[in-house]
Amino acid sequence: MNILISNDDGIQAAGVRCLAAALAQVGGHQITVVCPDRERSATGHALTLHKPLRVDPVREGFPPEVQAWACSGTPSDCVKLGLDGLLQQPPDWVIAGINQGANLGTDVLYSGTVSAAMEGLLEGIPSLAVSLASFTHQDFQPAAQVVLMLLEKLSLKPLEKPMLLNVNVPPLGLAEIRGMVLARLAWRKYTDLYEKRVDPRGKAYYWLAGEVVEEEVDPCSDVRAVAEGYVSITPLQPDLTAYAAFESLQRWGLSAFGF
């Protein structure tokens, strides 16, 4: 398979290097890595519009058969440039990850990892966003093995149409993971707290902090699945239309406004 890999943790991140090495070890894959040249977490689907993108080849830390690039742009820039500027032909898969930290519930709206995978889907390419649900756990091998298992399953039973699968892996050994489950996005709420500081020149600046204040209790949610030791798999789509609201909104009689 021809696979394009990106992330939002940057080209130096352990997760993307582990994933590229695992795919290369299997053999039979043409692997291209295009990642930000620095940390780009929580950049969402931002694109670089007002300055050029620059890329540099990266060899250290990747198997020799993997072509890797560091890009000055966002995660979405990386995938877009990879598809339209660096690859000679469209890949079979776009994979974003392995991210350090979960991308669960409504957090996907901020996620550079999920947005990188979504960019692949917007180009009609099936995509995976893969995250290790811990900011401190450093063993990415189980998550890499989950990716290999998913690709094998999907090669035997291909998707009916391209889609994005958001995959969150609990920070456990492979033998400890209880299985894979389909799960819906949870609704996560935070205490958004900006910590005010003052620089040596007396000018105020702010750091965003916050903690989850309400965890999902729905047993079908991705948050619950990962908490119970399962790999959560959530199909995502770019269409954010709230179709269920159409009926109630039609009662407004919009045509009567004279548009």
From Swiss-Prot:
Family annotation (InterPro entries): SurE, SurE-like_Pase/nucleotidase, SurE-like_sf
Cofactor(s) required, per the database record: a divalent metal cation
GO terms for cellular component: cytoplasm
GO molecular function terms attached to this record: 3'-nucleotidase activity; 5'-nucleotidase activity; exopolyphosphatase activity; metal ion binding; nucleotide binding
Signal peptide span: none
Catalysed transformations (reactions): a ribonucleoside 5'-phosphate + H2O = a ribonucleoside + phosphate
Coiled coil: none
One Pfam entry name: SurE
Entry keyword set: Cytoplasm, Hydrolase, Metal-binding, Nucleotide-binding
EC number: 3.1.3.5
Co-factor binding comment: Binds 1 divalent metal cation per subunit.
Subcellular location(s) of the protein: Cytoplasm
Enzyme's top EC category: hydrolase
Chain residues that bind a divalent metal cation: D8, D9, S41, N99
Family: Belongs to the SurE nucleotidase family.
Function per UniProt: Nucleotidase that shows phosphatase activity on nucleoside 5'-monophosphates.
Stored NCBIfam families: PRK00346.1-4, PRK00346.2-2, surE
Name used for this protein in its record: 5'-nucleotidase SurE
The species this protein was found in: Synechococcus sp. (strain JA-3-3Ab)
